[in-house]
Amino acid sequence: MWVALGMLWLLALGGPHQAWGFCPSECSCSLRILSDGSKARTVVCSDPDLTLPPASIPPDTCKLRLERTAIRRVPGETFRPLSRLEQLWLPYNALSELSALMLRGLRRLRELRLPGNRLVTFPWAALRDTPQLQLLDLQANRLSTLPPEAAHFLENLTFLDLSNNQLMRLPEELLDVWAHLKTGPFLSGHHARLILGLQDNPWVCDCRLYDLVHLLDGWVSSNLIFIEARLRCASPRSLAGVAFSQLELRKCQSPELRPGVTSIISPLGSTVLLRCGATGIPGPEMSWRRANGRPLNGTVHQEVSSDGSSWTLLDLPVVSLFDSGDYICQAKNFLGASETLISLIVTEPQTSTGYSGIPGVLWARTGEGAEAAAYNNKLVARHVPHMPEHVALATKPSMPSIKEELALQNFQMDVPGEFSREPSEHQEAQMVRSLKVVGDTYHSVSLVWKAPQAGNTTAFSVLYAVFGHRDMRRMTVEPGKTSVTIEGLAPKTKYVACVCVRGLVPTKEQCVIFSTDEVVDAEGTQRLINMVVISVAAIIALPPTLLVCCGALRRRCHKCRTGGSAEASGAYVNLERLGHSEDSSEVLSRSSLSEGDRLLSARSSLDSQVLGVRGGRRINEYFC
């Protein structure tokens, strides 16, 4: 009986000890005696087939190493029974995620090493359960960002390795913690307060890296030591490989809009250009939208000025009443957004009499264009939006009648009051000259003009309408062109057409009146008239010409027979003497010229018979 009691006593003493010191089959365990006499157990598990942490790790384990295994995840509270654990090493596994409860109960943990895994994120809030943590090794993972709240859990660390990750930037809150170490006192004989590893990350060197670059610039504090201080840029491409010490970055700034016009009043059909500028670092993204939610009826252009300001332009080519309203310009970067409002008021077409010293003269603006036309004290121009366009060369002008010419004399373009032209605009308005009309068919006509002061980018507009009608159509001519063909005209109809620089009001000299039947028949009629005139002239001029030639030949023969000096005293005048005489005393009277001599003149009009005067001497030109 005493033997049985002894056996039970031994089992009672040895059972718990054997359970306390049990080592998992996949691991190796070792026990060492510390200086204070306590025991520290180390468990190392490196089985490549291990996919989860062992479930029966001895509770007295102080150091646990799970390395080079196939462990992909750690279930929550797996290590909670290990209340004496001080070092947890999980290097070079296949960990892709960690539970926020993984560190629950590890109040004594001082080292957490997780290098060489596949972690994209880290449960920073889990560090609340490890108040004595001093070393955190996260090198060679896939971390791309650090949240701002991570700074609250990293203040007590003395070693932090974030090298060889995918970090492009660091939060300002964390940089502020480290900047405090730079300015804090360092006590002699003490170790550095933080060893930091940030190398081998794809840093984006823009304004968001300003604080980190400034932190490394001229670093002399012994409170913080970098494992590798020569950090380098990975992007943008222009700065790839450049060391932080060689950068000159500017601090980030939120967008700030430039002051400008807040309200615009524009006539119907004119071209409106809304402009909005902003500054910011990085350069803000500019955009337009309407306050009422309607789509934009224009084109947006972006540009950057030499001082770094960003500009956006909204081009409204032909404004209508639907374009009236509030337009919002927004400038935005990662720091925030700024907006401004511009009001556009489109006025309806107006007509009024403007005298300017000339009674009965009327000015007008087109319904949807800046061009206008008025004649005979009537408003005749109103824009009709669409008209096909074709460019052709003109060859012959069409002259208006006397009545039409008088109508164009009263044709005046002007704008009253606040719309009066500046001198520069007046010069542009006079750019079109020598407008001519040529007809191709009964249904088309060509216009040509001269614009010597126009550039290659100057665009012209053509306004035309049936004579006396109010509806006027408009065509736009390509820049650099000085001719256009108007098609779709009615035969045997009188029209008025004006050409001017786009956006300006045409003058009366830039308008012409024509008729399609006159233009088409003019060429054939002119040819017939030319043929009749030439035939009649040949019949009338042939007998006198023969008579003159015979008389000249007879005088020449008579002179040869006489052999005298008749050529100086006769009625015949020597051509060389007349054309090259240097003596003013040899001036001949018109009465000394015979009718035959006059017929030999190269000019038959009255002005050709008058002796020209050049350089103080008279000159006559004659041709046989």
From Swiss-Prot:
It comes from the Eukaryota. Residues 22-59 form the LRRNT domain. InterPro entries: Cys-rich_flank_reg_C, FN3_dom, FN3_sf, Ig-like_dom, Ig-like_dom_sf, Ig-like_fold, Ig_I-set, Ig_sub. The keyword Aminoacyl-tRNA synthetase does not apply. Residues 549-624 are cytoplasmic. GO terms for biological process: phototransduction; response to light stimulus; synaptic signaling; visual perception. Residues 1-21 form the signal peptide. The chain crosses the membrane at residues 528-548. Residues 431-519 form the Fibronectin type-III domain. Disulfide bonds join 276-329. Residues 267-336 form the Ig-like C2-type domain. May form a homodimer. Interacts with LRIT2; may form a heterodimer with LRIT2. Interacts (via its N-terminal extracellular domain) with metabotropic glutamate receptor GRM6. Interacts (via its extreme C-terminus) with the scaffold protein FRMPD2 (via the third PDZ domain); the interaction leads to their colocalization in photoreceptor synapses. This is Leucine-rich repeat, immunoglobulin-like domain and transmembrane domain-containing protein 1. It comes from Mus musculus. The gene is Lrit1.
